[in-house]
Amino acid sequence: MESEKSASGDEQRPSHAPAAPASPLAAGEFEILILSLPEAAARRRLVHAQLDFPGMPSYRVLEAVDGRALDERALAAGYDEQAAIRHCGRPLTRPEIGCAMSHLAAYRTMLERNLPLALVMEDDALIGLHAMQVLRRLVRMIDPSRPEVVLLSRVGRTSAWGGRKVDRNHRLYRVHGANGAYGYLITQAAARTMLQALHPVRTPADDWRHLMRARIVQVFALVPYCIGIAALGENSHIGEDRFEAEGARTVGRWLRKYAYQKFIFQLFVKPLLRLRKHASTW
């Protein structure tokens, strides 16, 4: 099925995507916001191949920001380099900046369209076989007025304390360590607080630990996860530059991290929080 273009330039599914709703979606429903660069034709084909079916939620493809193409004026308006250095110990790479701006644009779309909940996905996300059935159960458990994010991708660790049952096979746990922003549910309240806290950009889009520590949002994970990453996602627009930037961090910073992981984390944090590590299953 070929998608149309909205007035804003975003693609939207003709048979399902409603025009700016004045009232929230029905209980158990949500809209999907896909972030994709205009030239990412193969990735967009993957999106349509997964979502262009009767009974699937409405979705729209939002034009992502290519950080490599930003001019100096746009960069100065949307990115705070000094804040990034204070927070991350280094400037963000251009692809990281573009990615973070793209996710903030998705949050603005949520507020403009009065969406109580949205599933934000990057265009290399791979949706699990029964994901939508699980998500329709899950969204009924979420209060849109609370600033909450639920990661649907694989996470590093979760705490076993206070897990909530979603269905016979899935539970919701608090996140302790996670990277990646290619598939997550977000409430309208979380979109609002993240826009206020993260603009101009000063952290990567997937710095969930910072968001939790700063009490900007609460972050949970669905276990087992229901959104993976396609093979084409290995050729990330962000990955290589990010790894090079991470490698440039000071020796002292790495030594402090090593000491924490080797001693404090293993002896105190891990047993106290009953942390569980999650392996890749698909």
Regions found by a protein language model. Name each.
Residues 2-121, 125-282:
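An acidic/histidine-cluster motif and surrounding catalytic segment
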